């Protein structure tokens, strides 16, 4: 581990329900949760490790209470195994066992 990684803390296990004691404001927030299923009380003291642009690829700085501007990125899943994408939407292209692509109608030429 790098020295910067030693400064990172893991998010502690958090029960899905607050204790039976009278709920406080943080407990109410923890009970509601958010769309991601994370409870705010679980994130208390959480540190995030990210890479920086200082060209040091061995260490990641530890950031506390900082807002990161992250662009919206759409990641598309890979195509199903053995199927390639053709330029002609009416015709599918399949990948053979050797990893090369063939059109549906074209078989290997006979010798």
Curated annotation (Swiss-Prot):
Keywords: Phosphoprotein. Residues 71-76 are annotated as: Required for interaction with PPP3CA. InterPro entries: DUF4597. The modification Phosphothreonine is found at residues 79, 81. It holds the Pfam family DUF4597. Residues 12-34 are annotated as: Disordered. Interacts (via PxIxIT motif, when phosphorylated on Thr-79) with PPP3CA. This is Uncharacterized protein C16orf74 homolog.
